[in-house]
Each structure stands twice: as structure tokens, then as C-alpha cells.
């Protein structure tokens, strides 16, 4: 578990491609302090600011942000998946959205967190006959991290939705990490909605 790796009372996080803050909310619930969220979409930014007015949200193109000098224990982000998904024609790095992976990588290189977490669609593993995943691993490992990935399904972790995602974890060399174990019982949609008034 990540919490066991970080020896800080309240580990700090910088989240890239934050969307409406799903990952940040989960980390906040786990005791992490969000230092910065970067998001380009104005509607997502408005949602973030409405739901968490105290969060530091940067409404900017990630290309414009200089991460040098920034500090955080963890960097997270779901770099845009459309370039790797079935719906997005699977063009990979040939699609400009696919090249945003390199901006995630640049942030990791400049911030030098103890850990980074990235997520993407399962199809990224097969994109361009496996060349895409090799590039991703080579780039991230070149910064001195042990990098691993695993396909996790949200339904196995207390979410009432079957949603498979590749979760990349990078840790400083020598740090042990273990993915969380599956929960024994899945939550159904009716379980999730049981307290919602009619």
C-alpha cells in the first residue's frame, strides 16, 4: 500500500489531468494533502472549484507549467486515454492526445516524487503491438524508478462498476510495493444506492 511507503504524517500529492477530481478525492479520504491539481477542461475546473474551493487548481495547458522546484511525495494522473482506446481509433502516440504521456513523464522527472501513479485504459497494453507500453516503461524507468503495472477492475475494490484500468506505479529504487488485494464481496448498484432517498 502507498500509505505504508511514505513516512510522512500527511503525504502531499500533485495531480495532473485531474478531471473532476476522482483520484484526488480518494487520496484525500486516505489522508493525503493535495497541493496542486492541473486540468485544462474549463467545466472540470469549475466542478473542482465548486466541490473543493480550498484546493489549488490550475486551469492551464500542462505544456505551460514548469514543475521544476515543485515538491510532492506523490504525482498522480490519468493522461488522456482517447488515443489508446477502442473509441479513439487506437492511434497511440500518432494522436496528439497520446503525446500528453510525455508531459506526465516530464512532471515526474522535474518533481522527483517518491511515488507516481498513472492510470489508463486496458487497450494501452496492446496498442501498436505492445510498442506503446514499452515506450512508457522505458521512459519512466529512465528516471530511476521501479515501475510496474497491473490491470485492476474497480468492481473488486468497493465500486459498483466494472471498470478495468491499467494502474502504473513507480517507486524510488528499492522501495517495496504491493497492489491491494481484491475485496471478497462485490458491491452491487442497489448496494451503492440503498441510502439514496426515493
Segments (PLM) and residue ranges:
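Class I SAM-dependent methyltransferase "Motif I" SAM/SAH-binding loop
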Residues: 17-18
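A short, Lys/Arg-enriched amphipathic alpha-helix followed by its capping loop at the start of a domain
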Residues: 26-33, 51
Amino acid at each position: 500500500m502507498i500509505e505504508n511507503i511514505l513516512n510522512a504524517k500527511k503525504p502531499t500529492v500533485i495531480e495532473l489531468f485531474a478531471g473532476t477530481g476522482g483520484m484526488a478525492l480518494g487520496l484525500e479520504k486516505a489522508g493525503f494533502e493535495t497541493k496542486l491539481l492541473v486540468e485544462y477542461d474549463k467545466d472540470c475546473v469549475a466542478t473542482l472549484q465548486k466541490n473543493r474551493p480550498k484546493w489549488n487548481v490550475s486551469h492551464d495547458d500542462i505544456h505551460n507549467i514548469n514543475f521544476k522546484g515543485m515538491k510532492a511525495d506523490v504525482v498522480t494522473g490519468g493522461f488522456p486515454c482517447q488515443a489508446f482506446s477502442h473509441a479513439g481509433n487506437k492511434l497511440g502516440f500518432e494522436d496528439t492526445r497520446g503525446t500528453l504521456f510525455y508531459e506526465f513523464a516530464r512532471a515526474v522527472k522535474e518533481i522527483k516524487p517518491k511515488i507516481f501513479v498513472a492510470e489508463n485504459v486496458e487497450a494501452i497494453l496492446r496498442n501498436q503491438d505492445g510498442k506503446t507500453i514499452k515506450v512508457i516503461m522505458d521512459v519512466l524507468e529512465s528516471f530511476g524508478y521501479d515501475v510496474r503495472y497491473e490491470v485492476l477492475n474497480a468492481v473488486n475494490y468497493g465500486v459498483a462498476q466494472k471498470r478495468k484500468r491499467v494502474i502504473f506505479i513507480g517507486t524510488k529504487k528499492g522501495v517495496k510495493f504491493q497492489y491491494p488485494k481484491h475485496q471478497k464481496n462485490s458491491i452491487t448498484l442497489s448496494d451503492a444506492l440503498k441510502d439514496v432517498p426515493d
